[in-house]
């Protein structure tokens, strides 16, 4: 059973970056914009990120780091934090998923799950 005091939702919008990609060299660039929304009952600070990136061939890369794009935002109740970043893959299709480690105002650490989302070159999926 989840505790409603610690509820953070994550939404993602992705975009293929044709101008930064080199398909002939198996280089496919993607941008993603993420909104982290605090639906809990306490302000929470985003401490760190953990990404699992899987390309179309099944190769997996894990990325861990502090904050997001150099920030560790404090997200107040009912507020959100939006940022953009990107990744480069060697296949036209892949997916990302992971979590953010959050620190609530009362000192409790908890994970905000980032559900799997697809990265795909337009027209690459039938």
From Swiss-Prot:
Pfam family, one: DUF525
Domain ApaG, chain residue ranges per copy: 2-126
InterPro entries the record matches: ApaG_domain (IPR007474), ApaG_sf (IPR036767), Uncharacterised_ApaG (IPR023065)
Superkingdom of this protein's organism: Bacteria
Biological process per Gene Ontology, one example term: error-free translesion synthesis
Protein name, as recorded: Protein ApaG
Organism, as annotated: Pseudomonas syringae pv. tomato (strain ATCC BAA-871 / DC3000)
Chain's gene name: apaG
């Amino acid at each position: 059973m989840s505790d409603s005091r610690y509820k953070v939702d994550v939404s993602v919008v992705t975009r293929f970056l044709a101008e930064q990609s080199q398909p002939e060299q198996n280089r496919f660039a993607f941008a993603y914009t993420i909104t982290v929304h605090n639906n809990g009952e306490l302000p929470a600070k985003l401490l760190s990120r953990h990404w699992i990136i899987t390309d179309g061939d099944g190769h997996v890369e894990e990325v861990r780091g502090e904050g997001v794009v150099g920030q560790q935002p404090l997200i107040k109740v009912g507020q959100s934090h939006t940022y953009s970043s990107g990744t480069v893959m060697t296949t036209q299709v892949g997916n990302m998923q992971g979590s953010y480690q959050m620190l609530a105002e009362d000192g409790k650490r908890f994970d905000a799950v980032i559900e799997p989302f697809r990265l795909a070159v337009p027209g690459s999926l039938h």
